Structure formats: C-alpha cells, structure tokens
Amino acid sequence: MPHPLSLAHLSLIASPPEDLIRIAALAGFDLVDLRLSPATPTDRVYDDKERISLCRALLPLLQGNGLAVWDVEIIRLGDDTDPERHLPLMEAASLLGARRLKVVCDSDDPAQAATLLARLAELAAPFGLTLDLEYMIFSGVKSLGAALAVNRAAAQSNLKVLVDALHWMRAGDSMADIRAAPAGSLGYVQLCDGHLKAPWGHDALIREARTDRRAPGDGEFPLKDLLDVMPEGCVASVEVPLRPGGDPLMHARHLHEAARRITDLGENAS
C-alpha cells in the first residue's frame, strides 16, 4: 500500500500557510502539515481569533488545490501547561479537517506528562483529533520506549507515537523497537536523511533537527528499512528545511521526488 506524502511546514518554515499549500500542491504532495502554534521563539504567533480567520480563508485554497491538512502543530507540554488553553488550536485544526495534532513533551516527569497528555487527549476527542507524541533526544520524552510508556499511562485511545527518522536515529532506537511496539500505537513517520554520526552536544542536536536535515536518499539513514517496519500505508511527512537562498518550489519538488523514490522501494519490495 503506498504511503501518502505530506509536506511538513518546517520544510518551508518561512512560507505562510497560503504559500505552503500552493507549493505543496504544485510539487505533487497529497497532504500538508501546518504550524499554527509556535514550536520555537522565532515562529509566527497567532492569537486565537486570527488563527480561526486564517483557517476559514485556507479552506477554499485547500479545496481548489486538491489538498488536505494532515497534521497541525504544535502543542508543547510542560509541567505547568493548562491543557484547556489549547482548545482554540484544536478548534482550528478541526475547522481545517485535520486528522492529527502534534505534541512535544518538555516535562521530565513521566507521571505528570501522562496526566497532562491524558487530559489533552480527552479534550481533543470531540474534535475527531488524534494526538501524535513526538519524542526527541533533547525533550522530556527522549525515546520510542519512553513515548510508548507515557501514552500507555495516559490510557487514551486517540494517542499515537510519531516516529521522526532523525529523532529515531539520535535516540538509538532500532528496527526491533518499532516491530515490538504494540499494534496501533504508532501514528505516522517523518522522513528526512542525515549522517549516521550525531553532532556533539545538546545545542548541536537541536540545530541539526531545526536546520540541518537532508532530503531522503541524500544521507545515511536506513529509510527504506524504517518504512518497512512502520504501519503499512501510513502517512510519510517530509521534513527537511529549505536552506538559505533556496527556491521553495524547487525544494518541495525535490523533496517529493526523493521521498517517493524511497517509498517506492518499500512498495516494490513488498
């Protein structure tokens, strides 16, 4: 079963949602991920009313370009997070017809993380949203095993784990770890490539994740093998930031072609 391809907003983070949608459609993507809540201090910040107005304006653009929104990001969970504060983001995601909402956990307390995530999932359920917990070596939830444990403790049916190829590699997770994950516990995969050797230090790992990813096939990651152990036909979101001075459309087209070559390898082998 083919993997639908989505263009992650980080790939063209300087492009507003309107441009991202047009470019994703021209490049051949099936889906798009939209960053409507900041993940970093430099990201665009929308107030709640502005975000809803934007989403209403995006609906005809999505329809006209034959695209759907797969994922809206991002919710960052810290020890003092009020889950109810994220209801407006859930409303916006639902308005767009998004199916997923991405969550990153900054809490180092697994019990607190599970409590917050459980409440967040309860709030998201009436909107028809599944929450994907993305683990990162430099976040509070650092590995696939840790993410699965937090979700298991949260005990909500609309929780999944997002496997980002870069974070999977940097966490030292294996194919066997993914195979051993309980059925239905994994959501989708984010594709990028990179060096096998990790950069040294916390700041360097963050910098790599935000600015120094490579297109699928342009590095040393075992992406075809990764896709083989992920759920059949799961969405593959391509997350590779545009380098300074690059052309957004050319970049998106390159990412689509590169990702499709990797996914086609998996399909032809099955």
Named regions from a protein language model:
Residues 1-6, 65-73:
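N-terminal small/glycine-rich loop or linker at the start of catalytic domains
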Residues 32-33, 70-72, 101-103, 131, ...:
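Hydrophobic residues within beta-strands of alpha/beta enzymes
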Residues 40-49, 75-90, 204-210:
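Surface-exposed, active-site-proximal loop segments in enzymatic domains
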Residues 61-68, 76-161, 170, 250, ...:
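Active-site acidic/histidine proton-transfer and metal-coordination neighborhood
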